Regions:
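A detector for small-residue-rich transmembrane helices and their helix-helix packing motifs
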Residues: 1-158
Length: 158
């Protein structure tokens, strides 16, 4: 989770983590003020582990398989943030903005499709399971997030 294949891989993870991580850290500070830092670090480290577990079990007997990066944990941070701000625009390629909940659907679809093909040496299932971890963890930590999630999307669609 802390080693990356190359500078580009590291850059995109850090870039994404910076923008979404700061926002999620602020949410943790508001919701859990006395333990926010510890809980946030625990959330991130658990996301690294949980996101890679399915791949570990799938590939445990394959000595040629390698997986690097923190993309699963970054996906957890992004999806946890989307739960709180589903209508905030996420800009693809710097200029094409789409609401977070639509991005989440597209990202999930892309990760599932690419994982089926798995020809590009990217651990797409880590992205998928990291995203799932972010959703499940935030639901367990703050179940009320779903009320706000639905209200924001409903208000946007009016």
């Amino acid at each position: 989770g802390f080693i990356h294949a190359d500078f580009t891989h590291l850059f995109f993870n850090l870039f994404s983590f910076f923008f979404f991580g700061v926002q999620l850290e602020q949410i943790f500070n508001q919701l859990f003020p006395s333990i926010a830092s510890e809980l946030y670090i625990l959330f991130y480290v658990l996301a690294i582990v949980v996101a890679d577990l399915p791949t570990f079990f799938k590939q445990k007997n394959n000595p040629n398989y390698n997986s690097l990066g923190a993309s699963g944990a970054v996906s957890a941070v992004i999806f946890a943030g989307i739960l709180f701000f589903p209508t905030e625009k996420i800009y693809l390629f710097g200029f094409f903005g789409i609401p977070g909940f639509i991005y989440a659907g597209l990202f999930t679809w892309y990760s599932v499709e690419m994982d089926k093909r798995s020809r590009d040496f990217v651990n797409h299932s880590a992205h998928l399971y990291g995203a799932l971890f972010g959703i499940v963890a935030m639901t367990l930590l703050y179940p009320q997030v779903w009320i706000s999630f639905v209200e924001q999307i409903t208000a946007m669609l009016r």
